[in-house]
A protein has these predicted regions:
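Beta-strand-rich domains and repeat architectures in extracellular enzymes and scaffolds
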Residues: 22-48, 76-79
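Surface loop/turn motifs at the tips and blade-to-blade linkers of beta-strand repeat domains
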Residues: 23-29, 64-72, 118-127, 166-172
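Residue-level detector of Asp-centered blade-edge/turn motifs that repeat once per structural unit
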Residues: 37-39, 82-84, 134-138, 180-182
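Short, solvent-exposed loop/turn segments at conserved positions within beta-propeller repeat blades
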Residues: 44-45, 95-102, 145-150, 191-194
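Short loop/turn segments that connect beta-strands within beta-propeller blades
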Residues: 54-58, 108-112, 156-160
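Blade-loop segments of beta-propeller domains
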Residues: 59-94
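Beta-propeller blade signature
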Residues: 101-110, 155-156, 194
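Loop/turn-rich, solvent-exposed surfaces of beta-rich toroidal or solenoidal domains
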Residues: 170-194
Length: 194
């Protein structure tokens, strides 16, 4: 499915929450799951592929076999983030509204090849991964759950160790994406018909 990437007027080198955004242009891209950006490229995830575009919207690289080499079987990529030359992707085997083999797969941002995975902690209560964000200040990776949006789940980015879950109030239903900026978590949600 072809989606569009909206290029906003925010400098990507700085992770600051702005007060006003204006649409500058629309860039047609493959994929419709997640979008991340660094100072040179846009990264887009489809359910089963990763794409890399330059700032002019030209396809620079793609990985249509992103599940190769993963320690656990998977069939779905959700949200992504990019930090320090690595793409962090929420990945799972998704079947009938539940996720299994949830993991944060880490890819090289230059080649889009898999490097390692951060294992999911089943005792956390998380049953699916829809949103993913890297907290650059706290050195954490956060995952959200579309099925049960009461919590977000945090992992140490360097060690991969599960750290904690945070109870959200009020509870955002049907979360789709999350992003960390300036110590705040931004959460997007859909209407339940994703």
């Amino acid at each position: 499915m072809l989606a569009s990437l909206l290029a906003a007027g925010m400098p990507l080198g700085a992770q600051n929450l702005g007060s006003e955004y204006r649409l500058k242009r629309v860039i047609p891209v493959e994929g419709r799951q997640g979008v991340a950006a660094d100072s040179n490229f846009y990264y887009v995830s489809g359910s089963t592929a990763l794409y890399k575009y330059d700032k002019q919207g030209r396809l620079a690289a793609k990985n249509e076999r992103p599940f190769e080499g993963l320690p656990l079987a998977a069939n779905h990529i959700g949200d992504i983030d990019v930090w320090d030359g690595e793409i962090y992707a929420g990945i799972e085997t998704f079947d009938d509204g539940r996720g299994e083999n949830i993991q944060v797969a880490v890819y090289d941002a230059n080649t889009l090849k898999w490097k390692r995975s951060i294992d999911w902690e089943p005792s956390s209560g998380q049953v699916e991964v829809c949103g993913l964000a890297v907290d650059r200040d706290g050195d954490m990776v956060w995952m959200a759950d579309w099925v049960d949006g009461r919590y977000v789940y945090g992992y140490n980015r360097k060690t991969g160790r599960y750290v904690r879950k945070v109870h959200l109030r009020p509870v955002p239903q049907w979360q789709q994406g999350i992003f960390m900026v300036g110590g705040r978590m931004l959460i997007s949600a859909d209407d339940g018909d994703a």
